[in-house]
Amino acid sequence: MREYFVISDVHGKAGMLDELLQHWDGRSQLVFLGDLIDRGEDSRAVLEHVKDLVDQKGAICLSGNHEYMFLTWLDNPEKSYDHYRRNGGDTTINSLLGRPLNAPVDGVADAEGVKAAVADLVDFIRQMPFLLETEQYIFVHAGLDLELKDWRETSDYQKVWIRAPFHEGSNQTGKTIVFGHTPTFYLLHEAPGTNQLWLTEDGKIGMDGGAVYGGVLHGVVFGHNGIIERYAIKNDGLVAED
């Protein structure tokens, strides 16, 4: 069985990602669980790096709710900018346009600017899948609707936004579900900085270490018998306030 090196919720922390990828052997399948962008200081560098890994090394990058919000803003900036701003979007807009992170943003005009300046990165985000299913694992950003008769009918929106109903639901998929989205320190009721994963007896593994909130960036290697190796890179400076 192929091994998978999985990373979740980088949120613009390019330096932490570079450090974590030093542990990747180049042979295992590299999988990103979404939320490459927003809140951190260098979303553009993260997007460019991961795009290169997808194009040149066969990495797989799933969409997270922040990529979902980014595209929603681009497609309808007048209606959607405020919601995106409240979720850390200004950091990404400024990063993509080469401006200081705290530069003022025009939510409508800058949408056109982003489309023109980084069309390749926008296209990259648009083609991100929402789920990766293997013989043993389901990789997804936020989770699945486990109340459905067929979990595969989970909407794309739920795949990137769901929280408690998934966390509290019973995993009867027959597979291990690996997800991010909700920082593990919330799920574990601990302070930011814990390097523990959230593990359940029914086969759910939460691995958003809250890197941009002063936590860690997890890299987990999965194989036939579960977790083979795990890495946790500590926050390297900037801590998001929102």
Please provide the spans of the model-predicted regions.
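Acidic, His/Gly-enriched loop-helix segments that form or flank divalent-metal centers
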Residues: 102-216, 222, 226-228, 233
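Short, glycine/charged-enriched secondary-structure capping and boundary segments
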Residues: 19-23, 45-48, 75-78, 153-154, ...
